[in-house]
A protein has these predicted regions:
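Glycine-rich phosphate/adenosyl-contacting loop at the front of the ribokinase-like
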Residues: 2-102, 111, 115
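Structural beta-sheet core signal
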Residues: 9, 103-105, 143, 213, ...
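Anion (oxyanion) recognition and catalysis
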Residues: 91, 95, 121, 202-206, ...
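Conserved phosphate-binding/catalytic loop of the ribokinase/pfkB sugar-kinase fold
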Residues: 106, 130-132, 140-191
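Active-site-proximal loop->helix
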Residues: 110-123, 142-148
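A glycine-rich helix N-cap at a beta->alpha junction
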Residues: 119-135
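Conserved beta-alpha-beta core of the PfkB/ribokinase-like small-molecule kinase fold
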Residues: 181-267, 274-275, 280-284
């Protein structure tokens, strides 16, 4: 390996379309709220796929969004996704410290895809293998209620996987696995990477990489098996291959199948995760 520290990441990279000031307790929003786990309705703090939300409500997504937002345009458009955002932060913090941060992924060749590509080009992250495909760019509509939970605030997420379906393990080249640190971020929204995570982690460890996994709400598995714990890769062998696991409390509950924070942490320890961060905003 070179003297420079190389960090390579793959995972969720998308466009966030933020709508502020959405009242989660309003009569307008009430018909769209979830009634049971995985049903496709909205839940504060959680993510649902736009297609599932359409099925749940029985209306096209654009019509639903107009009803929820009053037909207004989004307040802000941003680079989003737990993989690329954390990598950008790391690159900004280490830019002058002999560290190079790289990203692998796929976007769509559409208007917001061009926005995303241009915006990423303004960051210190090196786009090692980021290409635009004929699929639509991954995006998340973010509904924000700053008054929710006694003023602590909360968000709800409506995601479209889009071109993230085109991101596959074979696109991760030797340079990826020759990195000092590899980061798999929010891969539940990049299905082919997520479903092969055990083998990818195994390959990374065999090449001497320090492995980091940071999670995101896994609606795909929540929908498929709402009563079962979420898989991370092919099987639980993934955990012993992770040097640092970063998850929030709700995701920790779903991944472990436990309903208590201490029990969830015990599960990860028993699975031989080397180190672990579980966030619990705003009560952390």
């Amino acid at each position: 390996m070179s003297e420079k520290i190389i960090v390579s990441g793959v995972g969720c990279c998308l466009v966030d379309l933020l709508y502020n000031g959405i009242d989660f307790q309003s009569e307008t929003l009430h018909p769209f709220l979830s009634k049971e786990r995985g049903d496709g309705g909205l839940t504060p703090g959680q993510l649902v796929f736009q297609e599932e939300f359409e099925q749940y409500c029985g209306l096209p997504f654009t019509d639903l969004l107009d009803k929820i937002t009053g037909g207004r345009v989004y307040d802000k458009i941003n680079i989003g996704g737990p993989s690329i955002v954390s990598l950008i932060n790391a690159a900004q913090l280490t830019e002058n410290n002999h560290c190079e941060v790289r990203f692998y992924g796929r976007g769509g060749n559409d208007e917001i895809g061009q926005y995303l590509l241009t915006s990423l080009g303004k960051t210190p992250v090196v786009l090692k293998d980021y290409q635009l495909t004929d699929n639509r760019t991954p995006s998340t509509v973010v509904l924000s209620d700053p008054t929710y939970d006694n003023g602590h605030g909360e968000r709800m997420f409506l995601n479209s996987i889009g071109a993230a379906w085109d991101c596959t393990p074979d696109q991760l080249d030797d340079d990826f696995f020759d990195s000092n640190i590899v980061v798999f971020g929010g891969t539940a929204l990049v299905p082919h990477i997520h479903d092969n995570l055990t083998e990818l982690l195994k390959k990374a460890k065999s090449r001497g990489c320090f492995t980091i996994v940071n999670t995101v709400f896994d609606f795909r598995n929540e929908k498929a098996n709402p009563s079962k714990k979420w898989p991370i890769g092919e099987n639980d062998d993934s955990y012993q291959l992770i040097d640092l696991l970063i998850t929030d409390q709700e995701e920790a509950f779903r991944l472990s199948g436990r309903k208590d924070a201490t029990e969830a942490i015990r599960f990860f320890i028993d699975q031989k995760v080397s180190s672990l961060i579980v966030t619990n905003a705003p009560n952390r």
